[in-house]
């Protein structure tokens, strides 16, 4: 005889004579497909049996991010876009970007690798919510302005969409001569004169004529 599963609340489980049994989901069912469970009952010590079918209605498709904004240090770092969903597939698309690579894959329930825009193996969302984790490498910010990128996460349904905003702090100002990291240079003007070129590399306003 099948036992009452842990996801169902069933009170009481035993009794004598006429009674009412209260049946409910322990937690709201989150799968996209109805869940049907059969539970058998019997008279103690005899062969009389009954069967109850409990039908938990499917939940709407959803995506629930753990957060809608992520702040990133100016030096760049690896971040994780995480949340929960019951969608058959998830598609990650940059709506605005500043050079971050496309999100082509992500982890489901911490172990299964899924491909953006492709049905997830085993369709875990059919029977309940799952976790997703997309790893994103944000490069160093070399400009002196904060910058933002927006990542859209879309499910199978056209209205199942969430947008994540990633904001990176402004980078440091720099001033180099002829090559990155070089702060000194010698310019030699030949005998008789002759224009020479000094290459300036910077991301900020600079001057070689300081104010007095």
Which residue stretches match the model-derived regions?
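Surface-exposed, short loops/turns at beta-strand junctions within beta-sandwich domains
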Residues: 26-34, 126-130, 138-146
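A short beta-strand micro-motif common to beta-rich folds, especially ectodomain repeats
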Residues: 32-45, 134, 145-157
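Surface-exposed binding patches on compact interaction domains or structured appendages
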Residues: 1-22, 62, 67, 87-135, ...
């Amino acid at each position: 005889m099948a036992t009452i599963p842990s996801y169902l609340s069933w009170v009481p489980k035993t009794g004598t004579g006429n009674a009412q049994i209260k049946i409910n989901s322990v937690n709201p069912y989150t799968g996209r497909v109805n869940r049907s469970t059969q539970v058998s009952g019997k008279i103690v010590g005899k062969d009389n049996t009954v069967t109850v079918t409990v039908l938990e209605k499917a939940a709407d498709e959803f995506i629930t991010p753990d957060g809608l904004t992520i702040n990133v240090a100016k030096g760049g770092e690896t971040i994780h876009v995480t949340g929960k969903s019951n969608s058959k597939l998830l598609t990650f698309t940059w709506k605005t970007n500043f050079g971050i690579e496309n999100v082509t894959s992500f982890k489901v329930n911490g172990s299964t690798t899924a491909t953006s825009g492709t049905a997830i193996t085993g369709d875990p969302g059919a029977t309940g919510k799952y976790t997703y984790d997309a790893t994103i490498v944000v490069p160093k910010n070399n400009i002196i302005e904060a910058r933002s990128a927006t990542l859209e996460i879309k499910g199978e349904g056209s209205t199942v969409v969430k947008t994540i905003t990633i904001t990176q702090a402004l980078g440091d100002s720099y001033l180099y001569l002829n090559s990155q990291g070089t702060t000194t240079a010698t310019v030699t003007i030949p005998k008789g004169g002759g224009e020479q070129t000094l290459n300036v590399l910077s991301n900020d306003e600079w001057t070689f004529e300081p104010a007095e």
